[in-house]
């Protein structure tokens, strides 16, 4: 869980920026968006297969160059 300790002389905007960066790095927002609506297991498998296919094609293109 991200947390930021704010110093006396530190402006709020800087602390907020640090917190947002930590949240992004931890993947909290993407996790929330993913869990926002129920996704059937069959759709999860389909998305996983499509992502694997994209990675394989990208790797293959990289090897060709």
Curated annotation (Swiss-Prot):
It comes from the Bacteria. Residues 39-65 are annotated as: Disordered. GO terms for cellular component: ribonucleoprotein complex; ribosome. Residues 43-65 have a biased composition (Basic residues). One of its GO terms (biological process) is translation. This is Small ribosomal subunit protein bS21. Keywords: Ribonucleoprotein, Ribosomal protein. Belongs to the bacterial ribosomal protein bS21 family. GO terms for molecular function: structural constituent of ribosome. PANTHER family: MITOCHONDRIAL 28S RIBOSOMAL PROTEIN S21, SMALL RIBOSOMAL SUBUNIT PROTEIN BS21.
């Amino acid at each position: 869980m991200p947390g930021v300790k704010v110093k006396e002389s530190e402006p709020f905007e800087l602390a907020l920026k640090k917190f947002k960066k930590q949240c992004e790095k931890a993947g909290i927002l993407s996790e929330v968006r993913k869990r926002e609506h129920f996704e059937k297991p069959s759709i999860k498998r389909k998305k996983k297969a499509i992502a694997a296919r994209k990675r394989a094609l990208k790797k293959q293109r990289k090897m060709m160059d």
